Amino acid sequence: MASADDRRFEVLRAIVADYVTTKEPIGSKALVDRHGLGVSSATVRNDMAVLEAEGYIAQPHTSSGRVPTEKGYREFVNRLEDVKPLSGAERKAILNFLEGGVDLDDVLRRAVRLLAQMTRQVAVVQYPTLSSSSVRHLEVVSLSPARLLLVVITDTGRVDQRIVELGDVINDEQLGRLRVLLGAALDGKKLSAASVAVAELAEQSDDDLRDPITRAATVLVETLVEHHEERLLLGGTANLTRNAADFGGQLRTVLEALEEQVVVLRLLAAQQEAGRVTVHIGHETAAEQMIGTSVVSTPYGAGGAVFGGMGVLGPTRMDYPGTIANVAAVAMYIGEVLANR
């Protein structure tokens, strides 16, 4: 849309705003009455005719009004100059709620719950990817002479606890050596390399530690390998049914896409530029199941590192300014919370 068509864009913007609010096709008289466009209904009708001819709006079969198309929503999003700012109270409430999380899992669970409530859409968060996580620390705790607790803490704040049943008892001196060996093998290593390092420990250890090292290594390898990338947290899936009519009979396929996770993970995994919010509208998701759906997403992380992607999924009839602001704010505060851990 050329810059000379600013008035027509104002008409388009008004149509998008009203349709998102009312769910009803919008007519020229309603636009003039609600938005004070400074022109007559006839002029607005002419502008709407041009917008329709250019594919920005369309006429539903049963109405004399018009609704935005994917192209119309894209133009609206591309020309957003301001997103709705959150109030100081809202920002403080977000931070306080996320800070209440006891570990990474809890923080992310709180984030999806909060984002779903704020946007009344489906919130999605990708767990930190295998390639981006390292072992910050391994703690080895003796529960009994023949039983150990292993606590793996990653730099992304994830904590895993596993029990190791030993075949025989070990004394404090052996426990100390075991702790040193495991720590040296794991501390600071990427998870993708840590499982290999710990698997090789048994061959390098003293005879009296070979069996306990083997047992501990088996448990650790299982733990480390479970930190895969295909983990997605969802919140607010019930919001889809509230907006079922907006999906034009495609709700089942959207639910299937969420269950399969592949499409959503692909969109989230593409988020690598910190602070940037991306909007995919309808066919831009490159997935047949997601027609009629928009995804607003951004990366989250801490200390300059991107841990994963997060965002909101809903119908194309979405409050884009508000959703963009909420997604950006929650991602920013997740980063603050994780950076301070």
UniProtKB/Swiss-Prot annotation:
One of its GO terms (molecular function) is DNA binding. Belongs to the HrcA family. It comes from Mycobacteroides abscessus (strain ATCC 19977 / DSM 44196 / CCUG 20993 / CIP 104536 / JCM 13569 / NCTC 13031 / TMC 1543 / L948). InterPro entries: GAF-like_dom_sf, HrcA, HrcA_C, WH-like_DNA-bd_sf, WH_DNA-bd_sf, WHTH_transcript_rep_HrcA_IDD. The gene is hrcA. Pfam families: HrcA. This is Heat-inducible transcription repressor HrcA. Keywords: Repressor, Stress response, Transcription, Transcription regulation. NCBIfam families: hrcA (TIGR00331). HAMAP family: HrcA. One of its GO terms (biological process) is negative regulation of DNA-templated transcription. Gene3D superfamilies: 3.30.450.40, Heat-inducible transcription repressor hrca homolog, domain 3, Winged helix-like DNA-binding domain superfamily/Winged helix DNA-binding domain.
